[in-house]
A protein has these predicted regions:
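Conserved helicase C-terminal RecA-like lobe
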Residues: 151, 352, 382-606
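Helicase P-loop NTPase motor core
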Residues: 24-32, 260-263, 268-361, 388-389
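Pre-Walker A (Motif I) flank of P-loop NTPase domains
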Residues: 15-18, 525-526
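N-terminal pre-P-loop "Q-motif" helix
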Residues: 1-15, 216
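A basic/glycine-biased coupling hinge at the interface between accessory DNA-binding modules
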Residues: 15-16, 26, 37-188, 192-200, ...
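Conserved helicase motor core of SF1/SF2 NTP-dependent helicases
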Residues: 26, 211-287, 294-299, 551
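Hydrophobic anchor at the beta1->P-loop junction of P-loop NTPases
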Residues: 20-22
Length: 606
């Protein structure tokens, strides 16, 4: 392997702490592999070396590259993830087994049960997922429960659920992935002799993607690295995009303070992208204030200029992009070398529907959220089901008081509901009979409307949107988040000619999504459709960043300066996935409302 000067300095580093700032496409994996080889070649025992990364796939790749470089089939060097290493330490001390680890499936099931028991009244999309993430945040950052304020539910409810979760976990002798870290830290603090044994075992520690480290992971690593502090960290503060998972970019920014005199090197040569892409991405990221200054350059060709394109709306945007994808494939660029990147996975939906319609093969990095599975969508589709003749008790109960009509569950006695029976139940209350007749009239009206007209009628004439606003206020949720679901549904309804046709389309769409989910693990065919979070570490010849608008990139929830900096880092990660061609697309209107291009577009061209 031929190294440039910066890479060589990193690979040849011997003892003491070192920070390697590795820009995109700068060969960081080669450097970590190379230094591991160099340590072993110089006489360091392979069993004394620990190489840590964040995913099993990355650890596997690192190990394979090391074995190939050394011409071996096995090694005593430990390659693993943080969770894997901490589990091995705990297993060795406490004789644990895999049965003590709470699997993701078990955790999901437990979250579902806890939400059903403690928070059944909260109808929020992704509540279980958000709850699991918040529990993880509390553990990762070691926040006292009384000082943590949940964003997804009232404080008392969150504390009740957290305590019930911990009680169940302890009674069943289970540890979740975050507990592995917390327990490992506790073990090292309470049993110095155990810590000393592992310090002697791992005398050289190399960490990949250091910008994504959490406070508790860093505390354990610092203990483990003592007393020699042979800690070799590799990362890029400009690519720190996982604060939502507990990562703290300031840990890397403060590394020189924690280790005064630590050696530093910048891998500033990009071997991946064209000169245009490197320059434009640098223009963007230089707008961040809290970062290490770097001058990334490339010896690659100039390439095509970074394209910035505006479209009337997301549907037109995707149709134009789909046509370009087809044309590029005809001209020799495989679909697998093209990627469509979005800020959120909800943003991927229009792309997926358009690619299905255009019969362009695609693959996904994320589990795509099903718009039609959202509780708001289910309510609207229930109204439409009733318009198509359904009279099931369960469906009436779902929408009876959305908006509030003060209808009692007791009024719906039979499995099949009739309006005559409802009128009879309330015969002594004229004002209730008026409400029932109005509901019957509304359902009849829906039968004569197009899907778009029907959604519009439910929103405004029936008063469902007002109900959603009141619900958001009562639950202290962002009103815009819920209204955007109604907007998405109305947009989806536009292209449908009949309610029956829309239901058939939804069924087909959901079936294809299930197939894609099954294929996700083994399939690597077609255009990549992904969020910016999930595409990190990957690269493609031709990349599109879509919906580059204010409120999307940067995301509407990013208000504070540090949140905007994280959004900019995310955009930077997206831009630097491209090898040869990069296109940034924005729209002029969304849901028939004018929207502004992202501020990031101005920063790219400055």
């Amino acid at each position: 392997m031929i190294y440039n000067n910066s890479q060589k300095k990193a690979v040849m580093h011997t003892t003491g702490p070192m920070m390697v700032l590795a820009g995109p496409g700068s060969g960081k994996t080669a450097v970590i592999t190379g230094r591991t080889c160099q340590l072993v070649t110089s006489g360091i025992s392979a069993s004394r070396i620990l190489v840590v990364t964040f995913t099993r796939a990355a650890a596997k790749e690192m190990k394979e590259r090391y074995l190939k470089a050394m011409g071996k089939t096995s090694t005593q060097v430990t390659f693993g993830t943080f969770h894997g290493v901490f589990y091995a330490i705990l297993r060795h001390t406490y004789r644990m087994s895999g049965n003590n680890i709470l699997s993701e499936e078990e955790k999901k099931r437990l979250m579902r049960e806890l939400v059903n028991h403690y928070a059944r009244d909260l109808e929020e999309e992704d509540l279980e997922e958000n709850l699991a993430r918040e529990i993880s945040t509390v553990k990762n950052n070691q926040i006292p429960l009384e000082h943590y304020y949940s964003a997804c539910m009232p404080q008392e409810k969150f504390r009740e659920i957290y305590e019930a979760y911990e009680k169940w976990r302890k009674e069943n002798k289970k540890l979740d992935f975050d507990d592995l870290m917390v327990q490992c830290k506790r073990l090292f603090l309470e049993r110095p002799e155990v810590l000393r044994a592992w310090q002697q075992k791992f005398q050289y520690i190399l960490i990949d993607e250091f910008q994504d480290i959490s406070p508790v992971q860093y505390e354990i690593v610092r203990m483990l690295a003592l007393p020699e502090n042979n800690l070799f960290i590799v990362g890029d503060d400009d690519q720190s995009i996982y604060q939502v998972r507990g990562a703290k970019p300031e840990i890397m920014l403060n590394f020189p303070k924690d280790y005064p005199g630590a050696a530093q090197v910048v891998l500033d040569k990009n071997y991946r992208s064209t000169e245009f892409i490197v320059k434009r991405s640098q223009c963007l990221i230089h707008h961040n204030k809290k970062r290490y200054e770097k001058a990334i350059s490339t010896d690659n060709e100039k390439g095509a200029p970074v394209a910035i394109r505006g479209y009337k709306n997301p549907r037109e945007e995707m149709r134009a992009v789909a046509e370009e994808l087809r044309e590029a494939e005809k001209n020799g660029c495989p679909y697998e070398e093209m990627a469509l990147l979005f800020r959120t996975n909800l943003g991927c939906r229009t792309a997926v529907e358009e690619l299905m319609e255009a019969q362009i093969p695609f693959q996904m990095r994320d589990a795509l959220p099903d718009l039609y599975d959202h509780w708001i969508a289910k309510d609207l589709l229930t109204y439409l089901n009733l318009a198509m003749g359904s009279r099931k008790r369960g469906e009436f109960l779902k929408i009876a008081n959305r908006p509030n009509r003060y209808l009692s569950r007791d009024a719906f006695e039979e499995a099949t509901v009739s309006f005559d029976a409802l009128l009879e139940y309330y015969e002594e209350k004229d004002w209730m009979c008026q409400r029932i007749r109005k509901l019957e009239q509304d359902i009849t009206t829906l039968t004569h409307l197009s899907p778009f007209g029907a959604v519009n009628y439910i929103r405004y004439a029936i008063g469902y949107e007002q109900y959603v606003k009141e619900y958001a206020a009562y639950r202290h949720l962002k009103e815009d988040d819920l209204i955007s679901v109604l907007d998405e549904l109305q947009e989806a309804a536009k292209s449908q000619k009949s309610i029956e046709g829309w239901f058939a389309h939804i069924e087909e769409y959901q079936q294809k999504m299930k197939e894609k989910q099954k294929q996700r693990a083994e399939s690597a065919e077609g255009v990549m459709v992904s969020t910016l979070h999930s595409v990190k570490g990957l690269e493609y010849d031709k990349v599109y960043l879509l919906d580059v608008n204010e409120g999307v990139m940067p995301y509407q929830k990013a208000v504070l300066a540090e949140a905007i900096e994280e959004e900019r880092r995310m955009f930077y990660v997206g831009m630097t996935r491209a090898r040869k061609e990069l296109t940034l697309c924005y729209v002029e209107e969304r849901f028939e409302k004018k929207v502004e291009p992202s501020r990031f577009l101005d920063e790219v061209i400055q």
